[in-house]
Amino acid sequence: MARYFRRRKFCRFTAEGVKQIDYKDIIMLKNYITESGKIVPSRITGTCSKYQRQLAQAIKVARYLSLLPYTDEHVRRESCTTEVP
């Protein structure tokens, strides 16, 4: 049986020597947000804790300034209750 080989995750920001994550870099921030608008955890992306905190703060600031949406789905959901005749 062959073993599954998983690539080692690494922090992209440490490798590139980034000092501070900029909230205005929307293209980069979109890579760390799911389709539903949630912030992707560091165990998935491989980002170290220092930059994960900066990343979360930058995403929250960008959302507050309307540079990023809070959610991609702006569909109004039907209520769970049914009407009684």
UniProtKB/Swiss-Prot annotation:
Gene3D superfamilies given in the database record: Ribosomal protein S18
Keyword Ribonucleoprotein in record: yes
GO biological process: translation
Any single Gene Ontology cellular-component annotation: cytosolic small ribosomal subunit
Keywords: Ribonucleoprotein, Ribosomal protein, RNA-binding, rRNA-binding
GO molecular function: small ribosomal subunit rRNA binding; structural constituent of ribosome
InterPro entries in alphabetical order: Ribosomal_bS18, Ribosomal_bS18_CS, Ribosomal_bS18_sf
Function: Binds as a heterodimer with protein bS6 to the central domain of the 16S rRNA, where it helps stabilize the platform of the 30S subunit.
UniProt similarity note: Belongs to the bacterial ribosomal protein bS18 family.
Subunit structure, as described in the record: Part of the 30S ribosomal subunit. Forms a tight heterodimer with protein bS6.
Protein name, per record: Small ribosomal subunit protein bS18
Species assigned in the record: Hamiltonella defensa subsp. Acyrthosiphon pisum (strain 5AT)
Gene (name only): rpsR
